[in-house]
UniProtKB/Swiss-Prot annotation:
The lineage of its organism: Bacteria, Bacillati, Bacillota, Bacilli, Lactobacillales. Belongs to the HrcA family. One of its GO terms (molecular function) is DNA binding. Keywords: Repressor, Stress response, Transcription, Transcription regulation. Disulfide bonds: none annotated. The keyword Repressor applies. It comes from Fructilactobacillus sanfranciscensis. Pfam families: HrcA, HrcA_DNA-bdg. The keyword Transcription applies. This is Heat-inducible transcription repressor HrcA. GO terms for biological process: negative regulation of DNA-templated transcription.
Length: 346
């Protein structure tokens, strides 16, 4: 455990490095510290911090920079979320105050807002139930002109639809009977269980009311694929490369591959019970992320699940500022999505 003075020196080293990206020496630190301490005393304390691997020396400078261990100590013990100013809070509220037809529209917009606020790469995730999501209701809709649409409402109020072509003409009573049959067989089942149901005798019975069964099944399969997918959105990918200077092509290729891989994204984010968590450099499995940090925030929507947001930026980011943005943003997003669900439930 560090002493109060050692903690203060470490904090000022990290705060200065986040602003300048330049190693700092004892003389410059002496001018910044709020207490009167000689350069010699600071050098001694920095030697202790260096010996304990909280700071390290670069080959190109006599000054010191934070180490991974130093950043971890700083994040866990010294960095406090900065309060967001009124202007930025109003910007978030205004941008989330649009007319949205689906949750995913809000979540997609959120990624753009968060990236714009920070100039970092932002990820936003649709709320996910802690238990498996099941079908709440299914509806067949006749669109006319040989087109039909199937609409599925999930337990978390996620709504997905898919239109399909039909070769037969249908009257309302046929669609009503087909819809009733489908709801009897599918309500309460997960996407995985629904796939198994369609391998059973239900298709024979459904064909009685809906001869275009093959087209319907293809539409259902398209919806189930969307439901099974993690619903997340990314904005500002190029910021990752601009923030940390020149990057080699293989690293860029690896990062883009990660962004387009659900498993890669899941492995990237910190698994934590805390509302806000931070994962840094050496804690990533991939060497090409050693210069980055990820701040993840979650928001609890009760019966509607838990949503997540994340920021990816350079490890020398201003943690108080970014923690403050993530904290304020997750609260605003929770309020906006809660309002959507309230209007939907009415």
């Amino acid at each position: 455990m560090l002493t109060e003075r050692q903690s203060m020196i470490l904090k000022y080293i990290i705060d200065d490095y986040s602003k300048t990206g330049v190693p700092i020496g004892s003389k410059a630190l002496a001018e910044q510290l709020p207490i009167h301490v000689s350069s010699a005393t600071i050098r001694n304390e920095m030697a202790v911090l260096s010996h304990q691997n909280f700071i390290e020396k670069l080959h190109t400078s006599s000054g010191r920079v934070p180490s991974n261990q130093g950043y971890r100590y700083y994040i866990d013990n010294l960095a406090k979320p900065a309060k967001l100013d009124t202007k930025r809070l109003e910007y978030i509220s205004e941008m989330l105050d649009g007319s949205f037809q689906q949750i995913d529209e809000i979540v997609r917009q959120s990624a753009d807002i968060l990236s714009h606020l920070t100039d970092y790469t932002a990820l936003t995730f649709s709320p996910e139930l802690t238990t498996e999501n099941t079908i709440k209701h299914l509806q067949l809709v006749n669109l006319g002109l040989n087109r039909m649409m199937v609409v599925i409402v999930m337990g978390n109020e996620q709504v997905e639809s898919q239109s399909f072509l039909v070769t037969n003409q249908y009257i309302d009573s046929q669609l009503s009977l087909a819809t009733n049959l489908l709801n009897q067989q599918l309500v309460g089942k997960t996407a995985r269980e629904v796939k198994q149901v369609f391998q059973s005798k239900i298709l024979t019975e459904l064909h009685t009311y809906l001869p275009d069964t093959k087209q319907f099944v293809r539409a259902i399969q398209a919806i189930l694929s969307k439901i099974d997918d993690d619903h997340y959105f990314i904005s500002g990918q190029m910021n990752m490369f601009e923030q940390n200077g020149k990057q080699d092509f293989s690293k860029i290729k690896s990062l883009y591959s990660m962004f387009n891989n659900d498993n890669g994204i899941d492995a990237l984010l910190e698994k934590s019970s805390k509302p806000i968590s931070v994962k840094i450099g050496a804690e990533f499995d991939n060497d090409w992320l050693k210069d980055y940090s990820i701040i993840t925030g979650s928001y609890d929507l009760g019966n509607h699940g838990i949503g997540r947001i994340a920021l990816i930026g350079p490890m020398r980011m201003s943690y108080p500022n970014m923690l403050g943005v993530v904290d304020a943003f997750r609260h605003e997003l929770k309020n906006r999505i809660s309002g959507y669900y309230r209007s939907y439930d009415q």
